[in-house]
A protein has these predicted regions:
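Membrane-proximal intracellular helices of multi-pass ion channels
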Residues: 1-508
């Protein structure tokens, strides 16, 4: 009993620390208010929204940090701190939306946790008319959540005690191999790369004549693979409004989404001129293969859907180069947006432009996600590759001998059975949550089967787009929104911390 109370004190202590840092971050949008004062919806309402939210966060954080002393955290305590910390940050991060937009707290909380988990599902429309500071805050929540809120907390207020345990709670972001000795050095390098790529994306988009504010917001949400946009039409806004360089913008964002979906240790190796990192491990090879295969299949299905392939085979009519380029651009953009779990859109994935095969593949991509150690969500490419290798191993054993001793080898290393069991358990937990979430959506809404399950696919995979429209998502019953909130958090923290949070045995 005493140990449980000590664990609770530690959880509240570190949550207080986290809220103090978040309180300072909540003051950053005031710069946007100052820049656009009197324009784009900026007024004393938005000033008060962020001042009050920041003050509340700082005060609660100060009280929790000082009222509950803590020396060290165990592994379970760190996982619980991770889950509670993300929930607490979302609770406070929702306040500017409530105060600035006068929306319900549930919708604001949904939007905040969608931001911090880099999911990108939204229950708001009218984005083009929203105050710029609110739009910036939405983008900033995704950037903070990209490499993990707790890793950001550690880099800002580094403490040796409990740091490794807390970092381990978000270890799905970073693989075991570190670019530099020492946890703080590793975090510093990774956040420097992250910030540098974000700055590069901002510059490239600004050079393409995208408005600077839009460039900043899209850079923040592209590298974090979050997908929030300051426009209702997402990236298609630029084509629809006749932007001269909308094609370049789409290709540029495709590239930066791809960077966000790659293990950041690969970026570090490339920046240190170790270019073999781009193909010398199994996960990155699977990554390139999936991108090429999915893009080709989606592109062919779109050409078939438009009737262009039929014209080629039946009448020998060649496909115009402009149509090929357009179809390729839409296909590769949407494949990258979903596979990296970013969720930007140049075309509604439920539209008639995409055929049945493409729509089914989008669901598969939602499950796979990006690479381990990236900002992407999903089950992760490495784990999919491991399950594929495991299936091949079992087939080999059945063919040769039931007693054949064949370990699972990946990149010249034998994978321990404990890791295989963990990946298999995580996979079945994913399936269970998808079934439960899809069932709840179908039961409490009027969505058809594909749309109902796509909502939970999107939430658990931290994707964003699904076959449910924003208007329908806004009207979802509270029970469905709460289910998606749990799904978004479970997907980002890879389920175990959330299961521990709701386990009575942990708190007895």
């Amino acid at each position: 009993m005493r140990n449980r109370f000590r664990r609770l004190r530690c959880i509240l202590h570190y949550t207080g620390h986290l809220l103090e840092v978040l309180g300072l971050v909540l003051l950053l949008p005031l710069v946007v208010v100052l820049v656009y004062w009197g324009r784009h919806g900026e007024s004393w309402t938005t000033v008060n929204a962020f001042l009050i939210s920041g003050t509340v966060s700082l005060c609660i954080g100060f009280v929790l940090r000082n009222a509950f002393a803590c020396d060290d955290l165990d592994t379970i305590g760190s996982m619980l701190t991770c889950a509670v910390g993300w929930l607490a940050c979302s609770a406070v991060g929702a306040l500017p939306l409530v105060l600035g937009l006068r929306c319900s707290y549930l919708d604001a909380y949904f939007e905040a946790i969608s931001g911090f988990t880099t999911t990108g599902i939204t229950v708001f429309d009218g984005l083009d008319l929203m105050p710029r500071s609110i739009l910036f805050w939405r983008a900033l929540t995704q950037w903070l959540g990209g490499l993990g809120i707790l890793s950001f907390f550690l880099i800002v207020t580094f403490r040796a005690s409990s740091a490794h345990h807390i970092f381990g709670a978000e270890s799905h972001k970073i693989s075991a191999t570190r670019p530099a000795p020492g946890l703080f050095n590793t975090l510093k390098i990774l956040w420097q790369i992250y910030a540098g790529l974000t700055l590069l994306a901002t510059i490239v988009l600004a050079l393409a004549k995208m408005p600077v504010f839009d460039a900043i917001c899209h850079a923040l949400t592209a590298l974090s693979t979050g997908g929030f946009s300051p426009h209702d039409a997402s990236i298609d806004f630029y084509r629809a409004t006749g932007h001269a360089h909308y094609r370049f913008i789409e290709y540029a964002l495709t590239f930066f989404m791809m960077l966000g979906g790659i293990n950041f240790l690969v970026h570090y190796r490339v920046l240190t001129r170790d270019f073999k990192a781009l193909w010398d491990n199994m996960e990155i090879r699977y990554w390139w293969g999936l991108i090429v295969a999915f893009t080709l299949v989606v592109m062919i299905d779109c050409l078939r859907q438009s009737g262009s392939l039929t014209a080629v085979f039946e009448r020998g009519t060649p496909i115009a180069a402009a149509e090929v380029e357009r179809t390729f651009r839409y296909s590769v953009f949407q494949v990258m947006a979903i596979l990296t779990t970013t969720g930007f859109g140049t075309m509604d994935i439920g539209s008639a432009f995409f055929g049945t095969a493409a729509k089914q593949l989008f669901l598969v991509m939602m499950v796979i996600g990006g690479c381990v150690g990236s900002t992407s969500g999903g089950f992760k490419v490495l784990r999919v590759a491991m399950l594929n290798r495991l299936m091949q191993r079992e087939l080999f054993k059945a063919k040769v001998s039931d007693r054949a001793s064949t370990g699972l080898v990946i990149d010249n290393h034998i994978v321990p059975d404990a890791e295989i069991h963990r990946v298999a358990a995580l996979f079945f937990a994913w399936i269970a949550l998808l079934v439960v979430g899809g069932g709840i959506t179908a039961l409490f809404s009027n969505q058809e089967t594909l749309a109902a399950f796509s909502g939970m696919f999107s939430a658990l995979g931290n994707i964003g787009p699904c076959y449910i429209s924003v208007a329908d998502m806004m009207e979802m019953p509270a029970v469905v929104k709460i289910t998606y909130i749990i799904g978004m958090l479970a997907g980002r923290l890879e389920i175990l911390p959330v299961l521990l949070l709701f386990s009575p045995r942990v708190w007895r």
